């Protein structure tokens, strides 16, 4: 039996017909003060976000430290004596706008010595089981500042793995979806100004594999670092608006109790709304929030993409992008992975969310002090492609 990992010595101690009731409360966080978002005046939304949405700073600091610890632990312990000579190269947490109470995040375990996307696909089950085993060891050793709970799998051969880090005292928890990934960007990590052609070749290779295997979007986790960078350096107030939209999304999820579009699609929609309609560092939050909800109601026209990491200059990539953008809408391409439409493929999900968004547009949170409705930003809903940056 391996000795306890000694990377760090700490221990875990113990509105009438308006929008429906929208309260900041969760079954997992019963002590949170109940606050009605729908009846919060537009002029007080910034205060609402500041007081009620960001994760507790103490928990956030402990969480970051524990993620670093888990990364070091997995790098030391994983795949010792395994049949496949892979090693953990790094662990990346994909979350920059965490909410108070309960949040969800991806934890991508990048593997070096893994030669291809196909190997990731074929060996995913083995990798998941190895990581699960090591996390269970860490859970028993209790060396983290917050509480670690590895979720049990319903199926022995499951290719999914999740664990929870929580602080009962702070009433805060984050559930992580763990995904092993081929480190396709390994050569670019330490290069501050990589040759754009390297990205082009990487995406051409990705497109070739995904179309051949009919696995579009399957390898998006391999580009998690680029997805992180897309949001990491955004304006603080834009991140606050993303938190507000995520909170609204969670309220809709609790009320409707049915599958909704992926949350990440709403985050990207928020970025698009700001880039297209404002770009002001000190924008009006109610206007931004209203713009996002109006875009949700127009989901059948959404066609959005960015050309930050991939573009139309390479013929193979260009041909593929044109095919993607001509598909049934909504289309919201992952800025880090052109094969992944983050809008999903279920129009019923969008129809449900659009109906809920429409019911919110008359709420007090969109009214000024004289009770007039705030105006949304002017955002184009139909632009021909290709263009330099973003299309709707």
Protein language model regions, located:
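C-terminal helix/juxtamembrane-tail motif
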Residues: 345-392
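Conserved beta-strand elements of beta-rich interaction domains across eukaryotes
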Residues: 94-95, 112-115, 168-170, 181-186, ...
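Short amphipathic alpha-helical segments embedded in low-complexity Lys/Glu-rich regions
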Residues: 85-95, 144-161, 260-267, 286-290, ...
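Conserved catalytic core of two-metal-ion nucleotidyltransferases
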Residues: 74-85, 101, 124-212
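N-terminal regions immediately upstream of nucleotidyltransferase
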Residues: 1-105, 109-129, 145-160
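A structural motif
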Residues: 189-191, 198-226, 233-246
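Amphipathic alpha-helical protein-protein interaction segments
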Residues: 52, 56-64, 98-100, 116-124, ...
């Amino acid at each position: 039996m391996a000795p306890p990992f000694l990377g760090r010595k700490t221990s875990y101690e113990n509105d009438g017909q308006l929008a429906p009731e929208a309260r900041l409360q969760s079954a997992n966080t019963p002590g949170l003060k109940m606050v009605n978002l729908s009846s919060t005046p537009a002029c007080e939304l910034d205060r609402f976000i500041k007081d009620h949405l960001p994760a507790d700073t103490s928990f956030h600091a402990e969480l970051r430290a524990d993620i670093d610890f888990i990364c070091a632990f997995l790098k030391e312990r994983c795949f010792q004596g395994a049949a496949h000579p892979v090693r953990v190269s790094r662990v990346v947490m994909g979350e920059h706008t965490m909410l108070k109470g309960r949040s969800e995040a991806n934890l991508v375990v990048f593997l070096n010595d893994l030669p291809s996307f196909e190997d990731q696909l074929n060996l995913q089950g083995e990798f998941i089981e190895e990581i699960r085993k090591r996390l269970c060891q860490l859970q028993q050793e209790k060396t983290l500042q917050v509480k670690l709970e590895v979720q049990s799998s319903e199926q022995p051969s499951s290719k999914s793995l999740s664990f929870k880090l929580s602080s009962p005292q702070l009433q805060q928890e984050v559930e992580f979806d763990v995904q092993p990934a081929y480190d396709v960007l390994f050569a670019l990590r330490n290069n501050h100004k990589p040759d754009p052609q390297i990205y082009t070749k990487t995406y051409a290779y990705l497109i070739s594999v995904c179309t051949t295997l009919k696995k579009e979007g399957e390898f998006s986790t391999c580009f998690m670092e680029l997805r992180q960078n897309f949001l990491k350096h955004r304006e603080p107030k834009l991140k606050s608006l993303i938190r507000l939209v995520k909170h609204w999304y969670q309220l809709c999820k609790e009320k409707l109790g049915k599958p909704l579009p992926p949350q990440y699609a709403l985050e990207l929609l928020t970025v698009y709304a700001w880039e297209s309609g404002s770009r002001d560092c000190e924008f009006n939050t109610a206007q931004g929030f209203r713009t996002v909800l109006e875009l949700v109601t127009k989901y059948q026209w959404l066609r959005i993409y960015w050309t930050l990491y991939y573009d139309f200059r390479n013929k193979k990539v260009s041909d593929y992008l044109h095919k993607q953008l001509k598909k049934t809408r909504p289309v919201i391409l992952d800025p880090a992975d052109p094969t992944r439409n983050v809008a999903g493929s279920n129009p019923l999900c969008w129809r449900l969310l659009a109906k809920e968004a429409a019911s919110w547009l008359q709420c007090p949170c969109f009214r000024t002090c004289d009770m007039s409705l705030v105006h949304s930003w002017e955002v184009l809903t139909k632009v021909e492609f290709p263009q330099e940056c973003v299309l709707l």
